[in-house]
């Protein structure tokens, strides 16, 4: 046996080299991390399986096959505009994370892009949100509804933009969360939402002795009493001035009717005519005499 030359089968050597890849899920995660989360797990598994689960060969195959044909969109992370950013949050508390992003490329984003969870702690059941296609250099805010973990501590997760075909692009967005029992992030966001809702509601013009703590019926009765109180001096003066008759004006009109009803000249030849005048007799039951 000593000094024997043995030719090893290349296929057998390849199988031995694959024995070091113990877990396919670990290889997929490592492949995805090395590519900067530019490919989804299914795509990573495709290239790994094509190269017999050799990580180095799979990465080379990916760049050889994809690079000449890929037009990758561009995205730059601008800032974290979350309300209460930097504050800790209590356990099991809903909150909203908001980031400002920009299309930093020269072409518009393709339709169907989304912001997707790619690693770390997920913070709730939402793992992706749709994002509208941004024009070159356009800026937009993207919000994600999240929930803090049930235990206190420091947590982190990663999110990234993704095309409809599963191609990741742009900066990795990090979520770093401090969970404490006395955290104020949830309260801060609730107060901010109340203030926004109050400012958007139409304001009512308050007049008179309006009581904001009284029931609507009492306020309505108070307004009606101010307008229709029969015992008030203003109502008496208004009613008297409106409905009181004007006797002098009526008598003047009646006298004018009496004077202008018959006008006889002294030289009139009809001396046997009886002249009837009506002065102040318009209020009787028979203004023209009884028949």
From Swiss-Prot:
InterPro entries: C6orf106_UBA-like (IPR039517), Ig-like_fold (IPR013783), N_BRCA1_central (IPR032350), UBA-like_sf (IPR009060)
The keyword Nucleus is assigned to this record: yes
GO cellular component, one term: nuclear speck
Comp. bias intervals (Polar residues): 212-228
Gene that this sequence comes from: Ilrun
Residues recorded as bearing Phosphoserine in the entry: 215, 222, 265
Location(s), subcellular: Cytoplasm; Nucleus
Alphabetized UniProt keyword annotations: Cytoplasm, Immunity, Innate immunity, Nucleus, Phosphoprotein
Annotated organism of origin: Mus musculus (Mouse)
Free-text function comment from the UniProt entry: Negative regulator of innate antiviral response. Blocks IRF3-dependent cytokine production such as IFNA, IFNB and TNF. Interacts with IRF3 and inhibits IRF3 recruitment to type I IFN promoter sequences while also reducing nuclear levels of the coactivators EP300 and CREBBP.
CDD domains assigned: NBR1_like, UBA_CF106
Subunit structure: Interacts with IRF3; the interaction inhibits IRF3 binding to its DNA consensus sequence.
Pfam family name, one: UBA_4
Name of this chain's protein: Protein ILRUN
Domain of life: Eukaryota
Primary localization class, coarse: cytoplasm
GO biological process terms held by the UniProt record: innate immune response; negative regulation of defense response to virus; negative regulation of DNA binding; negative regulation of protein localization to nucleus; negative regulation of tumor necrosis factor production; negative regulation of type I interferon production
Annotated segments matching region Disordered: 199-291
Positions with biased composition (Low complexity): 257-276
């Amino acid at each position: 046996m000593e000094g024997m030359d043995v030719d090893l089968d290349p296929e057998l050597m390849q199988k031995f080299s694959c024995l070091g890849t113990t877990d396919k899920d670990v290889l997929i995660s490592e492949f995805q991390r090395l590519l900067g989360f530019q490919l989804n797990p299914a795509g990573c598994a495709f290239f790994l399986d094509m190269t017999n689960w050799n990580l180095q060969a799979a990465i080379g195959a990916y760049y050889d096959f994809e690079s000449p044909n890929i037009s990758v969109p561009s995205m730059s992370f601008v800032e974290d505009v979350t309300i209460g950013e930097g504050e800790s949050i209590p356990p099991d508390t809903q909150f909203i994370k908001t980031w400002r992003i920009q299309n930093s490329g020269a072409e518009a984003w393709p339709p169907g892009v989304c912001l997707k969870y790619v690693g770390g702690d997920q913070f709730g059941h939402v793992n992706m949100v749709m994002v509208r296609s941004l024009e070159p250099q356009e800026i937009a805010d993207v919000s994600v509804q999240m929930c803090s973990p049930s235990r206190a501590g420091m947590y982190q997760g990663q999110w990234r933009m993704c095309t409809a075909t599963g191609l990741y692009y742009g900066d990795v967005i990090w979520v770093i969360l401090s969970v404490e029992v006395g955290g104020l992030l949830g309260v801060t966001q609730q107060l901010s939402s109340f203030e926004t809702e109050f400012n958007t509601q139409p304001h009512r013009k308050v007049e008179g002795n309006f009581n904001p703590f009284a029931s609507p019926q009492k306020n309505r009765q108070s307004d009606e009493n101010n307008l229709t109180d029969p015992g008030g001096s203003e109502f008496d003066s208004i009613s008297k001035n409106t409905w009181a008759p004007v006797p002098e004006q009526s008598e003047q009109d009646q006298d004018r009717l009496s004077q202008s009803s018959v006008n006889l000249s002294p030289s009139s030849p009809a001396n046997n005519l009886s002249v009837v005048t009506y002065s102040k007799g318009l209020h009787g039951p028979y203004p023209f005499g009884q028949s």
